């Protein structure tokens, strides 16, 4: 049974949970190559910069964490299942109630258009998932996350496993040893996400 204590301990040691939609179990992942975002070199795309400049979306933090994780837990287009199991949702809702899990949301005309969620520990933020209901909303939410992390002087933005979308946003892969070095340094910091 997944619980908050085990999840936090896992993050501190470079692991993260992932549900298997085939068997319903939650497994601990610790990939040899880790996707991270270098915060000091991040640059939003022109489209995202324009959307932010024009205030197309109302950006909020932790306004509706429950809705964000519920949207993230839905299967993606062209997929019938998701790695975000009910067990994972329950633990992250508890982490949010403890002030450790956070969401960044984009609203358009009062409706949730996109967002993301993750966990903040020390100077590390572990991005878990993102979704969009309107084009580019998750990218704008991600840009807002990066700006918040820079403002609070975070060192590490962990994206876990590389995929084309993360690479488009600017993620790079580092080996496990480098990841653990960066994680240890980030965890030494006493930083609040907000």
UniProtKB/Swiss-Prot annotation:
User: Where is it localised?
Assistant: Cytoplasm
Which reactions fall under this protein's catalytic activity? N-terminal L-lysyl-[protein] + L-leucyl-tRNA(Leu) = N-terminal L-leucyl-L-lysyl-[protein] + tRNA(Leu) + H(+); N-terminal L-arginyl-[protein] + L-leucyl-tRNA(Leu) = N-terminal L-leucyl-L-arginyl-[protein] + tRNA(Leu) + H(+); L-phenylalanyl-tRNA(Phe) + an N-terminal L-alpha-aminoacyl-[protein] = an N-terminal L-phenylalanyl-L-alpha-aminoacyl-[protein] + tRNA(Phe)
State if Transferase is listed as a keyword: yes
Q: Name one GO biological process term.
A: protein catabolic process
- Name the top EC class: transferase
* Enzyme Commission numbers on file: 2.3.2.6
Coiled coil spans: none
Q: Can you list the GO cellular component terms from the UniProt entry?
A: cytoplasm
Pfam families tied to this protein: Leu_Phe_trans (PF03588)
Q: Where is the major localization of this protein?
A: cytoplasm
Acyltransferase as UniProt keyword: yes
Name the HAMAP family on file: Leu_Phe_trans
- PANTHER family reported for this sequence: LEUCYL/PHENYLALANYL-TRNA--PROTEIN TRANSFERASE (PTHR30098), LEUCYL_PHENYLALANYL-TRNA--PROTEIN TRANSFERASE (PTHR30098:SF2)
Q: Which family does it belong to?
A: Belongs to the L/F-transferase family.
The protein's name in its UniProt record: Leucyl/phenylalanyl-tRNA--protein transferase
Q: Provide the species name.
A: Prosthecochloris aestuarii (strain DSM 271 / SK 413)
């Amino acid at each position: 049974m997944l619980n908050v204590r085990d999840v936090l301990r896992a993050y501190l040691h470079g692991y993260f949970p992932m549900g298997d939609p085939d068997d319903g179990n939650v497994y601990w992942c610790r990939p040899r190559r880790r996707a991270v975002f270098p915060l000091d070199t991040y640059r939003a795309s022109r489209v995202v910069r324009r959307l932010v400049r024009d205030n197309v979306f109302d950006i909020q933090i932790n306004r509706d964490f429950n809705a964000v994780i519920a949207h993230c837990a839905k299967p993606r287009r062209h997929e019938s299942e998701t790695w975000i199991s009910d067990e994972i949702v329950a633990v992250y809702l508890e982490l949010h109630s403890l002030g450790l899990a956070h969401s960044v949301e984009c609203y358009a005309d009062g409706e949730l258009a996109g967002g993301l969620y993750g966990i903040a520990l020390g100077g590390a933020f572990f991005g878990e998932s993102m979704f969009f209901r309107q084009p580019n909303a998750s990218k704008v939410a991600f840009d807002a996350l990066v700006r918040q992390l820079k403002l609070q002087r975070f060192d590490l933005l962990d994206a876990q496993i590389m995929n084309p979308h993360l690479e488009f946003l600017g993620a790079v892969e580092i080996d496990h040893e480098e990841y653990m070095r960066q994680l240890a340094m980030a965890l030494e910091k006493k930083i609040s996400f907000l």
